[in-house]
C-alpha cells in the first residue's frame, strides 16, 4: 500500500519519446511532487528535465530531476519505459530479446533503491517484460503491473464512439490478453451505459454485425502500426494511459482498469502476464476480475496466453 505522506515521488526509467511524454503527462496531472528521469543518454535526460522544469509556473508545484538510479530512491512508483523502440513493420514480440537484456540491467538497480515501490512496466512487449520484471525483482505480483491493454481498450471505445457518434466514455468494454496481435475484444460484455451493444445498435438503427466487429477490431489491433507508419512512434496516448494508472494507484481509487497482471487460474491460464480487468488501488493490483467470456472469446484468450508463453520459452537470456 502506498503510504500517506506529504510528498509523492515518481521515477521514469527511460527518457525517450514515451518516457519524456509520460513525465509531461504526469506533470500536467499534478499527481506528483517529484519526478525523476533516468536514461543512458544523460545529456538528453538533462535536457528533458530542464525543458519540463521551465513550465513550473503553469502547473502544480513539482520538482523534476534527471539523475541515476540512486536518485530514484524511495519512489512511490517506478515507471519503466526503457527499451529498444518498435520499428516500422516490427511486432512487439519481435522486440523481446533486445529488451530482456536491457531489463536484466535495469531491474536490479531499480530494486536496489526501491524495495517498497510499485513497478509499472510500459516497455514492449509489455506482458512479457512485466513477467520478466516480476521474476527479476522478486516483488509480489500485486506490485509489478504492466500497462496492459488500457490503451487498446481506449482505442476500442474510441472506434465504437466514433461510429455511433457517442462519447467513448459511455462505452463499457475491454480489450484483453496480449497488448499486441493476439489481443481479444470482449464483445459479449460490451455495453453502452448498461445497454448491451447489440440491443443499443438495434434500438438506434445502427450497424452491429460480424463485419462491424471485424473492422473495429482490426482498426484497434493495427492502430499502433498505423501511427508508427505515419510518425515513427506512439507516445501521447500511452502517456495518458500510464498517467491514468498512476492516478488510480496514488489515489487508492480501487477502479477497474485492464492492466497486465499475473494470471494464476482463469480459463486454465496460469503463470503468464495478460491484460485483465483489475481493481487498481494503493496496493497496485488488488484483484484480477474473472469476467465471463463466451466460448469464442475464451478460446482466443487461451491462444493469446499460449502465444506469450511460447515467446517467453523461446526467448534468449532467460
From Swiss-Prot:
Keywords: Cytoplasm, NAD, Oxidoreductase, Phosphoprotein. NAD(+) binds at residues 18, 39, 44, 69, 83-84, 105, 122-124, 147. Pathway: Fermentation; pyruvate fermentation to lactate; (S)-lactate from pyruvate: step 1/1. This is L-lactate dehydrogenase. It catalyses: (S)-lactate + NAD(+) = pyruvate + NADH + H(+). The active site is at 179 (proton acceptor). Belongs to the LDH/MDH superfamily. LDH family. Homotetramer. GO terms for biological process: glycolytic process; lactate metabolic process. Catalyzes the conversion of lactate to pyruvate. Its EC number is 1.1.1.27. Gene3D superfamilies: Lactate dehydrogenase/glycoside hydrolase, family 4, C-terminal, NAD(P)-binding Rossmann-like Domain. PANTHER family: L-2-HYDROXYCARBOXYLATE DEHYDROGENASE (NAD(P)(+)) (PTHR43128), L-LACTATE DEHYDROGENASE (PTHR43128:SF16). The keyword Cytoplasm applies. NCBIfam families: L-LDH-NAD, PRK00066.1, PRK06223.1. The lineage of its organism: Bacteria, Bacillati, Bacillota, Clostridia, Eubacteriales. One of its GO terms (cellular component) is cytoplasm. Substrate binds at residues 86, 92, 124-127, 152-155, 234. It is found in: Cytoplasm. It is an enzyme of class 1 (oxidoreductase). One of its GO terms (molecular function) is L-lactate dehydrogenase activity. The modification Phosphotyrosine is found at residue 225. The gene is ldh. Pfam families: Ldh_1_C (PF02866), Ldh_1_N (PF00056).
